[in-house]
């Protein structure tokens, strides 16, 4: 998705684990797009249903989390069919690489776009702080790498929310959630 948007001329596109595309705006990030993937496997192999939501225009009202539109990421937003074509072209290339080498084929590119690489973050679940530490991107399996007082934690669950920690707002001793494994 980020590749396709950049091919259209979008700038300041960043990624947030596990499935958001952000736009860097003055001093912050705003959600530009989200991706949901449902996987299933049977005797015929694996299948995926991929849903993509992309804001073409900024939202008309304030939302709980900052949101952006594609029109803010570029001069002159392209027509919808051009946006779809660019996204599908890049999606085909990414799925092909993933089929051969898994996430490791995309890891370096993902890390370069990672919004909070090397920054303090908080992992939230059910509106509670589960864990906080320094975010170091993702490993070859796509698990989030979070350095905490207990060491490097691998986060697998996509049912959590990752947020930056404002300066001076670190909690101490946040617990360890399900789906977190030390390395």
Which residue stretches match the model-derived regions?
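Catalytic beta-strand/loop module used to bind and position nucleotide/cofactor moieties
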Residues: 1-183
């Amino acid at each position: 998705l980020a590749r396709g948007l950049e091919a259209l001329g979008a700038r300041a596109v960043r990624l947030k684990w596990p499935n958001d595309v952000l736009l860097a705006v003055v001093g912050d990030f705003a959600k530009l797009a989200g991706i949901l993937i449902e996987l299933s496997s049977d005797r015929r192999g694996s299948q995926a249903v991929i849903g993509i939501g992309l804001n073409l225009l900024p939202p008309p009202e304030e939302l709980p989390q900052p949101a952006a539109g594609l029109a803010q990421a570029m001069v002159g937003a392209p027509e919808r069919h051009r946006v779809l074509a660019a996204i599908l072209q890049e999606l085909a290339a990414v799925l092909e690489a993933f089929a051969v080498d898994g996430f490791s084929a995309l890891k370096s590119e993902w890390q370069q776009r990672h919004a909070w690489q090397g920054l303090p973050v908080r992992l939230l679940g059910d509106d509670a702080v589960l864990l906080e530490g320094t975010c170091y991107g993702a490993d070859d399996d796509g698990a989030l790498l979070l350095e905490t007082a207990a060491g490097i934690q691998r986060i697998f669950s996509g049912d959590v929310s990752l947020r930056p920690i404002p300066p001076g707002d670190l909690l101490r001793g946040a617990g360890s959630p399900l789906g977190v494994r030390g390395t």
